[in-house]
Amino acid sequence: MNSSYKSRVFNIISIIMVSMLILSLGAFANNNKAKADSHSKQLEINVKSDKVPQKVKDLAQQQFAGYAKALDKQSNAKTGKYELGEAFKIYKFNGEEDNSYYYPVIKDGKIVYTLTLSPKNKDDLNKSKEDMNYSVKISNFIAKDLDQIKDKNSNITVLTDEKGFYFEEDGKVRLVKATPLPGNVKEKESAKTVSSKLKQELKNTVTPTKVEENEAIQEDQVQYENTLKNFKIREQQFDNSWCAGFSMAALLNATKNTDTYNAHDIMRTLYPEVSEQDLPNCSTFPNQMIEYGKSQGRDIHYQEGVPSYEQVDQLTKDNVGIMILAQSVSQNPNDPHLGHALAVVGNAKINDQEKLIYWNPWDTELSIQDADSSLLHLSFNRDYNWYGSMIGY
C-alpha cells in the first residue's frame, strides 16, 4: 500500500469524523433550542420576592411526591412521574399577601395538584416566616386553571378577594375560582385593578417564579393509607350555610353504605318551619348535630381539639365518622362562614410521617395535611382553627 493511497484513506476518514461531529453538534444545538423553546413557553407567576424560607423548600421537596401518590390513590388515578414547580404567592388587590407558599405539582407534564405550605398551628401565625412551623397540604386548588395556561407563554399574578381567586395578565383580570359566599354575584372583571403599590413591588422582583418541571425525587413512599371504605363526594356546598349538613350527609352515606342522605334534606329536617328561600341561611348548632346523629341511630359525642392520629386510625377502621368543627382565625363577626364543618375521611403515613385525609364541602376532591396541625388553610385562602370534633357518624 503506497503512501498516496494511505493519505487518501486518512483524508476520507477525517472528513467522515468531522461530518459526524458537525451532525452531533447540530443535534445537540437543536435539542437545546427545543428545550429553550419549551422553557420560553412556560407559565410565569409574578411574586414580590423570590426568597422562600429554606425549611419551606426542604419540606416541599421532601413530601410532594408522597402526597401526590396518596391523593392519586384516593381518586383511583394511576401514579406517574411527579415533579415540583417553583413556589408562588397569592395577593390581595391592595398588595397584602397571605402567610402561605404554593407549589404546582406536575405529573407526566400536567399540573394536577397544588402543594400548600401554611402555618402549622395558631401560635405560628405570630411568628416570622423563617421561625414559624409549617404544615404541608395537597389538593387540586386552582391546579387545572394553571395547567390550562401552562404552555401558553403566560405571565400572571394570582390575586384574591372575598369573591374568589383571579389571574391577572396584561392588565386583564379573570375570575378562576368563586368562593361560596351568599349573594356572590360575579362582578365585571374588567372593573378590578391591581394597586399601583403591588404593581411596583412585583416589578422590583428579580425574576418571576416559573411553573416548570424540576428533577423528581422518586423515593417518596406511602407506607399506609386508611380511609372510610364507602366514602364518596356526591355534592358540593355553594351559597349556603350548610357545611355541617354536607359533612353529616357524606359521613352517614359512607358508614351506612348508602346514598340516601343529602345536605338539603338534613337541613329541612332540622328546620321544618323555615321557608325554602330562607333555608340556605340556616346554620347548624352542636346540639342539632348530636340530636340528628342520634335520630339516625348514631351515638354522637363532642370531643375538644384535634383527635390523635391513632384515634382517627382506629375510628376509621371501625367505620365511625368524625366531623371537624373549625373557626375562622380572622374572627370577622360579619363573616357568614365564621364557623365551618368538614368530614374526616381517614389517615395515612407518608415517608414515616402521620397525615389526615379530609373533605371540605367547598371542594370536589379530598385534601391531605399533617396530622399534628390544628390549623386548616382552606380553599379560599383563609385559616381555620380546628377546635373540636363530633365523633360517631
Curated annotation (Swiss-Prot):
Residues spanning the signal sequence: 1-36
Keywords annotated in UniProt: Hydrolase, Protease, Secreted, Signal, Thiol protease, Virulence, Zymogen
Function description: Cysteine protease that plays an important role in the inhibition of host innate immune response. Degrades host elastin, fibrogen, fibronectin and kininogen. Blocks phagocytosis of opsonised S.aureus by neutrophils and monocytes by inducing their death in a proteolytic activity-dependent manner. Decreases surface expression of the 'don't eat me' signal CD31 on neutrophils. Cleaves host galectin-3/LGALS3, thereby inhibiting the neutrophil-activating ability of the lectin.
Propeptide intervals in chain numbering: 37-219
Summary of activators and inhibitors of this protein: Prematurely activated/folded staphopain B is inhibited by staphostatin B (SspC), which is probably required to protect staphylococcal cytoplasmic proteins from degradation by SspB.
PROSITE patterns for this protein: THIOL_PROTEASE_HIS
Record-annotated disulphide pairs: none
Subunit-structure text: In the cytoplasm, prematurely activated/folded SspB forms a stable non-covalent complex with SspC.
Annotated site, Cleavage, chain positions: 219-220
Protein family (similarity comment): Belongs to the peptidase C47 family.
PTM summary: Proteolytically cleaved by staphylococcal serine protease (SspA).
Species per Swiss-Prot/TrEMBL record: Staphylococcus aureus (strain MSSA476)
Subcellular localization(s) per the UniProt record: Secreted
One GO CC term, this protein: extracellular region
EC number in record: 3.4.22.-
Note: The cascade of activation of extracellular proteases proceeds from the metalloprotease aureolysin (aur), through SspA to SspB.
GO term, biological process aspect, one: proteolysis
Active site: 243, 340, 360
GO molecular function: cysteine-type peptidase activity
Protein name in the entry: Staphopain B
